[in-house]
Amino acid sequence: MTTGAPPFSGSSPQTTRPQTVAEKILSQRGSAAVYAGDLAVVEVDQVMVVDSIAQSFIERMERDLGAVPKYPERVSIVVDHVAPASTVSVAQAQKEAREYAAKTGVRLFDVGRGICHQVLMEEKLAQPGWIVLGSDSHSTTYGAVAAFGSGMGATDIALAAASGKTWLRVPESVKVTLTGDLRPGVTAKDVALEMIRVLGADGATYQSVEIHAGDRFTRGERMTLANLCVEAGAKAGLVVPGGEILTDYGYDVPAWVYPDEGAAYAREVEIDLSALHPRMSAPSEVDNVHDVAELRGLKVDQVFIGTCTNGRIEDLHAAAEVLRGRRVDPTTRLLVIPASSQVMEEALQDGTLLTLQRAGAVLGTPGCGPCMGRHQGVLAPGEVCVSTSNRNFIGRMGDKDAHIYLASPAVAAATAVMGRVALPEDVAQVAASA
Amino acid sequence: MPTVHVFARDHINTDEIIPARHLTTDVESELAKYAMEDYDKDFVRRVQPGDIIVAGADFGCGSSREHAVWALRGAGVSAVIAPNFARIYYRNSINNGFLALECEGITELFQDGEEAELDLKGGTIRNPRTGKELSFVPVPQFALDVQKAGGWLEYMKAGEDVEGERLDNASTSAGHGHAGTPLGDDPAKEDGPRPEQASGHQKEEHHA
């Protein structure tokens, strides 16, 4: 099936000065070379609609616009935020989404297929140089493969589906350069949290974060980095392709998708990976980042491993490594929700899920789970949760007096074993059975 | 005169404006019952049609949910004034013809519950008790046009074309963002001189 807008011309439109990755993509998908501050009207390669706004989307398309998707193959509906349905009204909305997909020919990824961003990546519905708009703020995730991914509301999404285009102000870029090598036990999530601390919760508002990581990090790890960029307010989070990482996954990486030498950045920061220790974001803003060691010992009621940030196979492997032969502390509950059916299948086949199940984890249907507080593990007043997700706002996962701490899967797993905030090395004191 | 509700904290997020547990509808009057619930659960009992929210920086950060705009509008809020806004919230405001006014120092101008004089045409907001006044960043002409049309969809439909022609025209007239219409979702960060506000522009009464 054809996806995406027509093929790229192969070279950027006539440029007058060096460009960032964001400027390159918006130039390619628009009609002229554009720079930060310019307005670009651009072709949209893929429009993603999640279940929770599907009704609003359909209403805007049919009642307000009287339009059908201009390119049905460029529109995907994903049932992931509250899947399976939790109430009759949610079930009704999802029923309407299914009917709409059948009627218009747009793609539908139904209950259990997984979280929108993970699914679109697995289906290669985000590719280097593409523009992907999603009705979910974590659509910055597509920047993992150097696609300009951005979140928008229902009205914008409907317009993009109806017209095949959108308008964007070309963002300034913040250049984040990662240097050095991570210590053992430090992960992409720790890097992402540190990056948000350095940038600040609104430190990249309206801007594109351009991450220069060299040939470090897998596709999944790059998704974690790009995913968190919206927590600094960013419009997009673009990880510059490096080495053979993307070609190994079978992507065509256009030669133009790299930043030019001398491109203009609003701000440049450097993060020395070798200096990082496992990090944790404390309530109730994502940039409130500390070393896990500072929070060690805090009693935890629930641990959640999953989401578009950290629900991939490498994340489940990291958790299983800590949990193998051990048990979740009896005063703590552990929820594990794979990010997609593909992740789940892999984790079933290689025994990871069995390891987690034996350790006392509660396994859930691939999807968003309790991340946004609508089902499958919401928190009571006063409860403390360590989560591998991306937001620790007040009320995010249930009651407004619950407390959410964000961390990597390995730290989350260690915390589940100890019943308190812990580092992976702390579980050594708990004997593992064979 | 509208009453001002001051929520001075920075980074008030969409989970506080309209918690996800209430996203089961997009009917504004329904959403309105829960507006600001996790920040101030009594707000919906105090707010009157036409009232103004004054908030700290980065208002509306977090989720892309357009419900954050619908809930406030449904509750009768006519405008939110903050030093700056999270981008998706800001864009959603423009698209819905809802006023999001950028004004540095605004949280110092009012105490909660005071009345305000908002002069959209003049670009000022005044506290009649203290006599102090601040100018807000002019609303982009594009946003005013969208507001006049009743929202982005209506604006596009008025162009009789959802195929994108109107978008293309907008691009051309914007001169790529400098002179002319600052069509971007970030007028506060526009380089160069601010475009003149059309002084004779027909302003709609904001949603009362």
Curated annotation (Swiss-Prot), chain A:
<keyword id="KW-0100">Branched-chain amino acid biosynthesis</keyword>
<dbReference type="InterPro" id="IPR015931">
    <property type="entry name" value="Acnase/IPM_dHydase_lsu_aba_1/3"/>
</dbReference>
<keyword id="KW-0411">Iron-sulfur</keyword>
<comment type="similarity">
    <text>Belongs to the aconitase/IPM isomerase family. LeuC type 2 subfamily.</text>
</comment>
<dbReference type="Pfam" id="PF00330">
    <property type="entry name" value="Aconitase"/>
</dbReference>
<keyword id="KW-0028">Amino-acid biosynthesis</keyword>
<dbReference type="GO" id="GO:0009098">
    <property type="term" value="P:L-leucine biosynthetic process"/>
</dbReference>
<keyword id="KW-0004">4Fe-4S</keyword>
<keyword id="KW-0432">Leucine biosynthesis</keyword>
<comment type="pathway">
    <text>Amino-acid biosynthesis; L-leucine biosynthesis; L-leucine from 3-methyl-2-oxobutanoate: step 2/4.</text>
</comment>
<comment type="subunit">
    <text>Heterodimer of LeuC and LeuD.</text>
</comment>
<keyword id="KW-0479">Metal-binding</keyword>
<dbReference type="InterPro" id="IPR018136">
    <property type="entry name" value="Aconitase_4Fe-4S_BS"/>
</dbReference>
<dbReference type="GO" id="GO:0046872">
    <property type="term" value="F:metal ion binding"/>
</dbReference>
<dbReference type="InterPro" id="IPR001030">
    <property type="entry name" value="Acoase/IPM_deHydtase_lsu_aba"/>
</dbReference>
<comment type="function">
    <text>Catalyzes the isomerization between 2-isopropylmalate and 3-isopropylmalate, via the formation of 2-isopropylmaleate.</text>
</comment>
<feature type="binding site">
    <location>
        <position position="308"/>
    </location>
    <ligand>
        <name>[4Fe-4S] cluster</name>
    </ligand>
</feature>
<dbReference type="InterPro" id="IPR036008">
    <property type="entry name" value="Aconitase_4Fe-4S_dom"/>
</dbReference>
<feature type="binding site">
    <location>
        <position position="368"/>
    </location>
    <ligand>
        <name>[4Fe-4S] cluster</name>
    </ligand>
</feature>
<dbReference type="GO" id="GO:0003861">
    <property type="term" value="F:3-isopropylmalate dehydratase activity"/>
</dbReference>
<keyword id="KW-0456">Lyase</keyword>
<feature type="binding site">
    <location>
        <position position="371"/>
    </location>
    <ligand>
        <name>[4Fe-4S] cluster</name>
    </ligand>
</feature>
From Swiss-Prot, chain B:
<dbReference type="InterPro" id="IPR000573">
    <property type="entry name" value="AconitaseA/IPMdHydase_ssu_swvl"/>
</dbReference>
<dbReference type="Pfam" id="PF00694">
    <property type="entry name" value="Aconitase_C"/>
</dbReference>
<comment type="subunit">
    <text>Heterodimer of LeuC and LeuD.</text>
</comment>
<keyword id="KW-0456">Lyase</keyword>
<comment type="function">
    <text>Catalyzes the isomerization between 2-isopropylmalate and 3-isopropylmalate, via the formation of 2-isopropylmaleate.</text>
</comment>
<comment type="pathway">
    <text>Amino-acid biosynthesis; L-leucine biosynthesis; L-leucine from 3-methyl-2-oxobutanoate: step 2/4.</text>
</comment>
<dbReference type="GO" id="GO:0003861">
    <property type="term" value="F:3-isopropylmalate dehydratase activity"/>
</dbReference>
<comment type="similarity">
    <text>Belongs to the LeuD family. LeuD type 2 subfamily.</text>
</comment>
<feature type="region of interest" description="Disordered">
    <location>
        <begin position="163"/>
        <end position="208"/>
    </location>
</feature>
<keyword id="KW-0432">Leucine biosynthesis</keyword>
<dbReference type="InterPro" id="IPR033940">
    <property type="entry name" value="IPMI_Swivel"/>
</dbReference>
<keyword id="KW-0100">Branched-chain amino acid biosynthesis</keyword>
<dbReference type="InterPro" id="IPR015928">
    <property type="entry name" value="Aconitase/3IPM_dehydase_swvl"/>
</dbReference>
<dbReference type="InterPro" id="IPR050075">
    <property type="entry name" value="LeuD"/>
</dbReference>
<dbReference type="InterPro" id="IPR011827">
    <property type="entry name" value="LeuD_type2/HacB/DmdB"/>
</dbReference>
<dbReference type="GO" id="GO:0009098">
    <property type="term" value="P:L-leucine biosynthetic process"/>
</dbReference>
<protein>
    <recommendedName>
        <fullName>3-isopropylmalate dehydratase small subunit 2</fullName>
        <ecNumber>4.2.1.33</ecNumber>
    </recommendedName>
</protein>
<keyword id="KW-0028">Amino-acid biosynthesis</keyword>
